[in-house]
Amino acid sequence: MAKYKKLGSVTLFDAQNTKEDLSKLGNPLERLSQVVDFEMFRKALEDVFENKAKKSHAGAKPYDVVMMFKVMIIKHYYNLSDHQVQYQITDRQSFREFLGLASGDKVPDEKTIWAFSEKMAKSGLSERLFQQFVDELNEKGLIFNEGQIIDASFVLAPKQHNTRDENKDIKNGKGGDLWNDNSNKKRQKDTDARWTQKGGQNYFGYKNHIKMDKVSKFIKKCLASAASLHDSQALDYLLDESDQGQSIYADSAYVGQCNILAKWDMIDEICEKGYRNHPLTEEQKESNRKKSSIRSRVEHVFGFEEG
């Protein structure tokens, strides 16, 4: 008699069965595919990414621009690093389904993802298309606007082995003037990442700041910064008129931002902070627990990145 439950043999219907199981569990990417016509973004993308002057058809063909924009949606929604995007697309069937990739299709590598993201950002396309995408979700009723969750997460970068003088120049904003006589070395240097400390632990890299719709859990707005930027300093950028009159949920790092909240008439659901000789009361602790239970919904977003 078998000790464990048999998992069953692989059949031709496994992929379809898995897709149906994901649908029953509420696959958010499948819902996006059903309600958003991503072809609406093609012309704007091709205007930036297609090389009109290129006559030769030699060399590897680029990935479809709409599919790559969907890759950016995955990166944006789950707040993933370029490396994690590549890994998760390879690993997760729901991601491949969303992108229209079969199991044997080649997945864009992290360098391709980075290059696409950089070109979108530098052309101004990133902010414009993501706003159009969020507007479309609003119109389709996928963003509920019944409260916003604010949070930040570290994205670690490789440590740089610079001299003290080089680090001083970088800190003073002169990093672009370094290593001009050695292009290979300069290409490998990261002059934007910064050191910071949190909870007694040192971090080197960047920080992702996000605003997430409380109900749909979709990231409506995000900001990438050096790790040294305090969480609260991103708040003014993240909030806008679409948040008018809503509740805001955040940890105690955002305490003291009354003027910014008042600007949009927001309801303060930020966790309170205890101070020396003024610890939190039991009532405040209980209030924080209730707020944190809602704020913790953001953890699934950062789970891929910090896991």
What are these regions (language model features)?
Residues H83, Y87-T90, G100, P108-S252, ...:
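Polybasic low-complexity intrinsically disordered regions
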Residues K171, S247, S252-G307:
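Helix-centered, glycine/charged polyanion-binding patches within enzymatic domains
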Residues M1-D47:
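Charged, often Cys/His-bearing segments associated with DNA-binding zinc-finger transcription factors
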Residues Q93-S103:
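Short, basic interhelical loop/turn and adjoining N-cap
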Residues V65-H76, D91, W114, Y237, ...:
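Contiguous, well-ordered alpha-helical segments that form the cores/surfaces of helical PPI scaffolds
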Residues G59-A60, L101-D105:
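A Lys/Arg-rich helix-loop hairpin that forms a DNA/phosphate-binding surface
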Residues E30-I73:
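Basic, short loop/linker segments at the boundary and entry of helix-turn-helix/winged-helix-like folds
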